[in-house]
Swiss-Prot record:
Name recorded for this polypeptide: Glycine betaine/proline betaine transport system ATP-binding protein ProV
GO molecular function, one term: ATP binding
Summary of subunit composition and partner proteins: The complex is composed of two ATP-binding proteins (ProV), two transmembrane proteins (ProW) and a solute-binding protein (ProX).
Any one of the GO CC terms: membrane
Record's bilayer topology term: Peripheral membrane protein
Protein family per UniProt: Belongs to the ABC transporter superfamily.
Domain ABC transporter: 29-265
Residue intervals of the CBS domain: 282-341, 343-400
SMART domains membership: AAA (SM00382)
Positions that bind ATP: 61-68
Cross-referenced SUPFAM superfamilies: CBS-domain pair, P-loop containing nucleoside triphosphate hydrolases
Gene3D superfamilies in alphabetical order: CBS-domain (3.10.580.10), P-loop containing nucleotide triphosphate hydrolases (3.40.50.300)
Bilayer-crossing regions: none
Amino acid sequence: MAIKLEIKNLYKIFGEHPQRAFKYIEQGLSKEQILEKTGLSLGVKDASLAIEEGEIFVIMGLSGSGKSTMVRLLNRLIEPTRGQVLIDGVDIAKISDAELREVRRKKIAMVFQSFALMPHMTVLDNTAFGMELAGINAEERREKALDALRQVGLENYAHSYPDELSGGMRQRVGLARALAINPDILLMDEAFSALDPLIRTEMQDELVKLQAKHQRTIVFISHDLDEAMRIGDRIAIMQNGEVVQVGTPDEILNNPANDYVRTFFRGVDISQVFSAKDIARRTPNGLIRKTPGFGPRSALKLLQDEDREYGYVIERGNKFVGAVSIDSLKTALTQQQGLDAALIDAPLAVDAQTPLSELLSHVGQAPCAVPVVDEDQQYVGIISKGMLLRALDREGVNNG
């Protein structure tokens, strides 16, 4: 994947004459020691990240770790003290104010924790407000605002007012307002933190669905570990202004960089964080491709050659058809029937988004590995009993 957003050796030091801090940084003094000596606050220290196009990249850490400062450096709401912020290879730390406005209008948008909706304006007008300030004509901004509201499921509330909406719906308006400019990059600063847990989960699911359709580059700030694990393709952990580890949720869980990260991830409920798609294994063994010339005899030979009791049938477009067994294929052959007649009732396929906690009974009772499919019924892979147990055992390994 191409790199969409990159930061190199980025610093933010708050206070007058911030350059004074660098000699102490070079001497290895801590954030607290620098503050004591100079009165300067080290917000971000020598951060470097490369964020790929189309990924959800989560930055997390405890309060004061620098994560909210970091996200504001990415669109220059806060000016960096030193370092580069590259969008599509262009260092926005060096561009003019006019060029920066164009970047904010067309390439990058932000969603805050506070909904920040205008109470006297309708949902539609709130959604279009940023475009109005940018000078976009009324017809175009109305069309784009309605499209953004459709994306978040609020098109029927276009003429309602903010006080007529629930908290979750108001945050959807905030998200729609950012989506209306169709940005390449979406910055989200603890956007769901103020919501009730159930609504927060719904919004996380909504974001994942939107991402599947539009593949924007999303930088998501969070202090909620479960949230980060649920939505993040990769996670960066910050401590005292520094990025101490970057990796996939799985990589960080299995190989924490230090005690801070290890403590951060202690007690995470693997069964709630990971879903079927995260552990499903796609293997060519036992995979039967349904074509006009491929019947029960060919399928039976394939399974016997691979020494497998069960197989999984897919057709054109990778669409999952069902499972077969050696016995069901032999029966279909005896009765001179086609491959469809050999399909067995179990195991039923599970949705790729199913949490591991909901798979235990299904996988445990299935006669073979359980097939996993996406929302379009496309084959994702299989989950065996051993695979599920190994995935769930990672929590014990990390906490032991």
